[in-house]
Structure formats: structure tokens, C-alpha cells
Amino acid sequence: MELVFLGTGAGVPSRGRNVTSIALSMLNERNAIWLFDCGEATQHQIMRSQIKLSKLEKIFITHLHGDHIFGLPGLLSSRSFQGGESDLTIYGPVGITEYVETSLRLSGTRLTYKIIFNEIEPGLIFEDKMFSITVDELDHGLRSFGYRIVEKDKPGALNADKLIEDGVEPGPIFQKIKKGETVTLADGSVINGKDYIDEPQKGKIISIFGDTKATASELELALNADVLVHEATFEGDKEKLAGEYMHSTTLQAASLAKKANVKKLILTHISSRYDRDASKELLIEAQSVFENTEIAYDLAVFPIGE
């Protein structure tokens, strides 16, 4: 899995940063892409990346401010033009259905695939054999959500070397042992498959937040995450200003990461007042509180767990 930051700016596009969109690429895990927010010109950013719209399975919208949704109609239309036929699910606050359907209707856009809308409330919004996703409200004036994506633990690998050392020849019997079954060998000896399976591989946790000021609900969403993606619209000494505009500072994001025991913090949603050099200072500031912090730039790619 990896996170691809398609847009990392706040409010409006700038020369260095487009508005918000983040892709969670899971090609190895489920041959799919999940998209978090879709600001204006997201599809242009996708063309500059390795992402294929044909792999897009789900879109998650954090809130309905324009810099997070104005790219949706064009992206949905382009997916259709490119031959997309598989269903696409869009999750988001109440109003996302009306916004998308109205945009498509007024523009006379007809899609070649079905959109399934899921207007979310706090709690579990998705679960299958591989992942679960829970959401909770943040504090941004307009209803804004944070997403917690939990990968389920993977079964432990079969320790084939140990089996061979114990005299078990490779063959169909390995499949039964891999399932943890008890099997009887040709010589009459009995082995327990569970003795030859490594410990389950812990699934990853990714927390991706929409715009917010510092608020209590963030902690549970971020707790023990492998990666926390958090806005940092302002520098640390602008806490009062950030609060007035319902946003966060670098230091607030870093403090949350430390308190929540996350492994890596990635800062995004950077105000256009900060150029690339100033952004480096934002990073240094956050790292003074939480060392394993990165600052995202457009088209940056972050492998999960590294």
C-alpha cells in the first residue's frame, strides 16, 4: 500500500500545490485505488501520476467545501470516457449525493457505470474480509469527517523450511498444513499444522482527516495508526488564527501524533502563504514535537509502513 498525494494545498490552487486529494493505492492488496477528497483539477494530477482511473473503486469525501469536491464531476466523467464500467462507491457527508447528481444532470453527463452513494454518519461505514473503515466528526464548522482505515491481520506464512527439516516432503499436504489442519503422514506420524504457521501479520492502520481545528474526537481515530494524515494549514504560532478559521497548526498536528502513538505523521493542506522554503520550516517545527513527521508535496508517494 502507498499514499499518493495528488493535491496538498489549502483553499485555492497555488503554483506549487493543487487543492486536496489523496489516493490510497492498494494494487497488490486488492487491485484497487481509493481516493480521499477530489479538489479541482484532481484528474489533471492523476494524469501526472501512475494512477489509473480504471482502478478507482471508492471515493471518500471528508467535507463539502469546494477545494475538496470541485474536481468530482470532471473526474467521474473522464472515468466514463475511459471505458470505466465497474460500480463506483462514493462516501461523504449528507449532500454529496445531491451535489454529484445535480452536477451530472445539469451538464447532461451520462456515465457508463453505476455510482453507489453512501452518506455517512459516525461509526463503521465499510467492512469486508480485508478492511474496515470507521469515521467520526471533526470540528470545522461545516460537517467534516476523519477516516480510520484498518487492514485486517493477514494469516501467518507457512514455515516450509521447518516442515522439510522435520521430514515432510513438499506436495499437496502442504496446503492442508497451511490451513492449520492436523494431518497424518505416510509413516503414521501426526503433525499439527498450527505448529508450522508463523504469527499473523499485523494489518496496517491509516488515519486520514479532513479539515479541522484541534478536537477531542481526533485521538481515537488516530490511535496507534501506522500513518496519520493531518492538515497543517498554519505554523505553530498561528494557533489563534487557526482556531478562528477552524483549522490546525503544525504543532497541534504533531502533538496529536505523539499523544496517539502513531508511527508516522504526514502534514498536508498547507496554506499558500508558505512557499517551498517556508514549508521546510513547518516540517522542522513539527519534528520538534514528533520526530517522524513528513510534509507532503504534490505527487509525493509514501509507502505504508516505511
Curated annotation (Swiss-Prot):
Enzyme class (EC, first level):
hydrolase
EC number(s) from the headed UniProt entry: 3.1.26.11
- Residues annotated as catalytic: D67
Sorted keywords for this record are: Endonuclease, Hydrolase, Metal-binding, Nuclease, tRNA processing, Zinc
* Keyword Hydrolase among record annotations: yes
Which InterPro entries does this entry report, sorted A to Z?
Answer: Metallo-B-lactamas, RibonucZ/Hydroxyglut_hydro, RNase_Z/BN
Which CDD domains does this UniProt record tie to the protein? RNaseZ_ZiPD-like_MBL-fold
Catalytic activity field: Endonucleolytic cleavage of RNA, removing extra 3' nucleotides from tRNA precursor, generating 3' termini of tRNAs. A 3'-hydroxy group is left at the tRNA terminus and a 5'-phosphoryl group is left at the trailer molecule
Q: Which GO terms describe its molecular function?
A: 3'-tRNA processing endoribonuclease activity; zinc ion binding
Which of this chain's residues are annotated to bind Zn(2+) 1?
H63, H65, H140, D211
Cofactor(s) needed by this chain: Zn(2+)
Offer one Pfam family short name for this entry. Lactamase_B
Chain sites annotated for binding Zn(2+) 2? D67, H68, D211, H269
* SUPFAM superfamilies registered for this protein in UniProt: Metallo-hydrolase/oxidoreductase
- Copy out the cofactor comment: Binds 2 Zn(2+) ions.
Function of this protein?
A: Zinc phosphodiesterase, which displays some tRNA 3'-processing endonuclease activity. Probably involved in tRNA maturation, by removing a 3'-trailer from precursor tRNA.
Q: Which family does it belong to?
A: Belongs to the RNase Z family.
- What is said about its interaction partners and assembly? Homodimer.
Protein name (Swiss-Prot/TrEMBL): Ribonuclease Z
> Could you tell me which species this protein originates from?
Listeria monocytogenes serotype 4a (strain HCC23)
List the taxonomic lineage: Bacteria, Bacillati, Bacillota, Bacilli, Bacillales
* Gene label: rnz
